[in-house]
A protein has these predicted regions:
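C-terminal subregions of glycosyltransferases and related glycan-biosynthesis enzymes
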Residues: 2-115, 159
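Active-site and donor-binding regions of nucleotide-sugar-utilizing enzymes
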Residues: 135-295
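Donor nucleotide-activated moiety binding/catalytic core segment of transferases
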Residues: 185-201, 207, 361-404, 437
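A donor-sugar binding/catalytic signature common to diverse glycosyltransferases
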Residues: 202-231, 382-427
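C-terminal alpha-helical cap of glycosyltransferases
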Residues: 479-492
Length: 492
């Protein structure tokens, strides 16, 4: 706020040192005029502080009286109107001129950009259309996949309420095939904006777009996408790779969530804190984990192995690492360098095992498994990680929340935490003590990973009691009926 006074003081002082018709004075005046029409004008229109429309507007009027005449003649039509308003002290003319100018700029931007045009249509047209009472819109991971809890809620609705609902799925791949009668729309297209405006129900596993404005009659179900291990949102002291306004944005977005799913009591308590959420918490378990409790899960796993080309005579090791907050290309695009020595794993375990690789959807780097064909299978692009759990005999992870879900299977887990101290103490911090509460050992080298896998029997015995305690704490709500409970609560 003090910069205005400093700017005027600097201008007046500099102008007093040079001749009125000099080139330097002409330059100073051009800078002042640009400041007035570009920056100051916006303050007249948008600032909550009336000082911009009173004392400062009058001060600018006095400055304009001494601006070089040639500049006034060369100015644009908009600038001339603003100068006239300033010279005459006509605040209403100034506000009107600025409003029209900003609207013109915005409209030009809309015409040049499809996304902006779609947002404009959403705000001014689609959001005012009659609500489609039985339309349900689903989105997972920004349209990257048909997966997670929205998938299982969708399939439960489609199977148990045939013909009742119209289903809209946000998927960026138009070739994606959906079961039942779901309609695919691409994220941020005109159709996407339309259904944001008219759908009655929303089932998202991530935050909604910032420009979305939930209508009073609409129902927003936020499933989220994992039991929290790493500190989230308002529990983070510093947000490394996200937008500087991340927390402010998050606060506004969570205000529109009518329901939030919790997979366990631990998550319910954390979500209330880290999201500052005081809405309807559905303590149902995660619908995505219903698959892990099906009585025919082994038969499903066999068919999945055949579909993916995984050898039926080999055991499978799933390696599912998460991203590192300080290794990124930009917002939501993270680097990842594979630290697990796959060549050594193949040499030591290749006769009995194959490895399934699955990175987090935020990771932008593709994994290179050249030369490891028929041993390492990169399933990072496979939509549904829950299906990958089913075909995995062992899970290796780090700080990913996958282990909370995988524990439903009560199969062995290893935690390859080669950078534990950095991740825990510098980057994020954890909600649980990884050294005393995890249902498996922390390992720091590929050699340790191999040793633990070769000695699974003793490993299982060593961690049996801790695993049982972990299961009771984090998996006891998940009995295969979470989707049913969610649907009964939300789709009344």
């Amino acid at each position: 706020e003090n910069k205005f006074d400093e700017f005027l003081m600097a201008y007046r002082y500099s102008a007093s040192l040079v001749a009125p018709d000099s080139y330097i004075r002409y330059y100073l005046d051009s800078k002042m005029l640009r400041y007035y029409t570009k920056f100051f004008a916006r303050k007249i229109r948008r600032s909550k502080d009336d000082i911009w429309r009173n004392e400062r507007f009058k001060a600018m009027g006095e400055i304009l009286k001494n601006i070089h005449p040639r500049l006034l003649n060369k100015s644009s039509r908009y600038s001339k109107k603003m100068i006239k308003a300033g010279l005459n002290g006509d605040l209403e003319l100034a506000k009107k001129t600025v409003s029209r100018h900003l609207a013109k700029i915005k409209f030009k931007k809309i015409l040049k950009n499809k996304n902006e045009m779609n947002k404009y249509l959403y705000r001014h047209k689609y959001i005012n259309k009659p609500l489609e009472e039985n339309t349900v819109m689903f989105e997972t991971f920004m349209g990257k996949s048909y997966a997670d809890s929205p998938k299982y809620i969708y399939e439960y609705l489609a199977k148990n309420y045939p013909g009742k609902y119209k289903f809209i799925w946000v998927l960026n791949d138009p070739k994606e095939k959906l079961p039942y009668e779901g309609k695919i729309v691409k994220r941020f297209t005109r159709e996407y904006a339309y259904y944001l405006g008219v759908s009655k129900y929303f089932v998202f596993n991530i935050r909604q777009p910032l420009w979305f404005r939930k209508r009073e009659e609409q129902v927003f179900l936020e499933t989220w996408h994992g039991t929290p291990l790493k500190r989230l949102a308002f529990d983070q002291e510093e947000v490394t790779a996200a937008s500087p306004t991340y927390k402010a944005q998050f606060y506004r977005q969570k205000q529109e969530w009518d329901y939030l799913i919790a997979p366990n009591k631990f998550s319910s308590d954390i979500f209330k804190s880290c999201f500052m959420y005081d809405g309807n918490m559905l303590e149902t378990g995660y619908p995505r984990n219903d698959l892990l409790s099906l009585p025919n899960r082994d038969a499903i796993a066999l068919e999945l192995k055949k579909k993916l080309g995984i050898p039926l005579d080999k055991k499978t090791i799933l390696y599912a690492p998460t991203w590192r907050d300080d290794e990124y290309y930009g917002n939501g695009k993270y680097k990842f360098k594979l630290k697990l020595d796959l060549d050594l794993l193949k040499q030591q375990l290749g006769d009995e095992y194959v490895v399934l690789l699955r990175t987090h959807h935020y990771i932008a780097d593709a994994l290179d498994v050249t030369g490891l064909e028929e041993f390492a299978y990169n399933l990072s692009k496979y939509d549904d990680i829950t299906e990958i759990y089913l075909i995995s005999d062992i899970c290796i992870t780090d700080y990913s929340s996958v282990f909370f879900d995988y524990a439903n299977l009560k199969r062995p887990m290893l935690f390859y935490t080669y950078d534990l101290d950095k991740y825990r103490d510098v980057l994020r911090g954890f909600y649980i003590d990884m050294e005393t509460e995890l249902p498996g050992p922390l390992v720091y080298t590929t050699e340790e990973v191999i040793d633990k896998i070769k000695n699974l029997n003793s490993l299982n015995q060593e961690y049996q009691q801790r695993y049982e305690q972990f299961y009771e704490r984090f998996c006891s709500w998940e009995d295969g009926n979470a989707a049913m409970r969610v649907v009964e609560a939300v789709f009344k």
